[in-house]
Swiss-Prot record:
Keywords noted in UniProt: Cytoplasm
InterPro entries with a match to the protein in the record: UspA (IPR006016)
Function: Required for resistance to DNA-damaging agents.
Stated name of the protein: Universal stress protein E
A single cellular component GO annotation: cytoplasm
Superkingdom assignment: Bacteria
Family named by the database record: Belongs to the universal stress protein A family.
Subcellular localization: Cytoplasm
Matching CDD domains: USP-E_repeat1, USP-E_repeat2
Species the sequence originates in: Salmonella typhi
Length: 315
């Protein structure tokens, strides 16, 4: 079955070019499905206008929404004329991430696409507070799109956690690989690589325990990771030459390998309770994300429950 048949694109209000919408159309052309172009807007100055009656305030708000809707329609004009099914929705809300997630739940959207801003000098992607909230709390996969064309022959790199003995991590690893393979098959038969990072011996252990042999320890850790990677790749009939078990910190290993492979996208798993973490615990994943220079797809476990609740109020 084709994936991502009900996409939600978060529109960037500050620029005419919309890379996330472009990527959604690119996916639509290959796997079908429909697209909702969604923009939450809020202007505090309208709320401060005490001289206006509630009706006048509502009318002003509605005027801004209408203007923005027409602006998005103009950005999407070429796609709409080509018959791409794009629904446009603009809402007034002062917490963008909340209303985006509420829209995802209410509309049963199976993928969220949003533009990732790029630091001009560093080439690294900059994530806004709204981006982080979505990556941590959105129940559907979130695709952060970099403002660049998909690289010719761009590969997909899946970051997996080979160290954990927790069963939910194994299930999440398998979900990441399965969904990426499925997507890759439908989009240009993209080549899929897997990566796992393993830690080096802490120096202080070697100092405090003179009889401790770091090389034996490192070999044992590497061996465990290689066995775990072998079990995972064999489950999906993946060739050994596209799997990578690398020594070092995930936030160094994964971005470096992504750059070396000229990956178009890195796929990460996240476990909601601890923030981002599939290949990592705590903030490690967030450091990985901070170092990436390509698209990012973040996927949650099947049992993930978002802390964001549906808004009962009808604006």
């Amino acid at each position: 079955m084709a994936m991502y048949q009900n996409m939600l694109v978060v529109i960037d209000p500050n620029q005419d070019d919309q890379p996330a919408l472009r990527r959604a159309v690119y996916l639509h052309q290959r796997i079908g499905g429909k697209i909702k172009a969604f923009l939450p807007i809020y202007d505090f100055s309208y709320e401060m206008t005490t001289l206006l009656s509630p009706d006048e305030r509502t009318a002003m708000r509605q005027g801004v929404i209408s203007q923005r809707t027409a602006w998005i329609r103009e950005q999407a004009k070429y796609y709409l004329e080509a018959g791409v099914p794009i629904e446009i929705k603009v809402v007034w809300h002062n917490r963008p991430f909340e209303v985006i997630i509420q829209e995802v739940i209410a509309g049963s959207h199976d993928l969220v696409l949003k533009m990732a801003h790029q630091h001009d000098r560093l080439e690294a992607v900059i994530f806004t507070p709204t981006d982080w909230h979505l990556l941590r709390k959105c129940p559907s996969p979130v695709w952060m799109v970099k403002d660049q064309p998909w690289p010719e022959g761009g590969k997909a790199l899946v970051a997996v956690n080979l160290a954990s003995e927790e069963p939910y991590h194994n299930a999440l690893n398998e979900k990441l690989v399965k969904e990426t393979l499925q997507l890759a098959e439908q989009v240009n038969h993209t080549e899929v690589h897997l990566v796992g990072a393993y830690p080096v011996t802490p120096i202080n252990i070697a100092i405090e325990l003179p009889e401790f042999d770091p090389s034996v320890y490192n070999d044992a850790i590497r061996g465990q990771h290689l066995l775990a990677m072998k079990a995972l790749r064999q489950k999906f009939s993946i060739d050994e030459k596209v799997t990578h078990v690398e020594k070092g910190l995930p936030e160094e290993v994964i971005p470096d390998l992504a750059e070396h492979l000229q990956a178009g996208i890195v796929v990460l798993g996240t476990v909601g309770r601890t923030g981002l973490s599939a290949a990592f615990l705590g903030n490690t994943a967030e450091q990985v994300i901070d170092h990436l220079r390509c698209d990012l797809l973040v996927i949650k476990p099947d049992e993930y429950q978002t802390p964001v609740e549906l808004d009962d109020e009808d604006d």
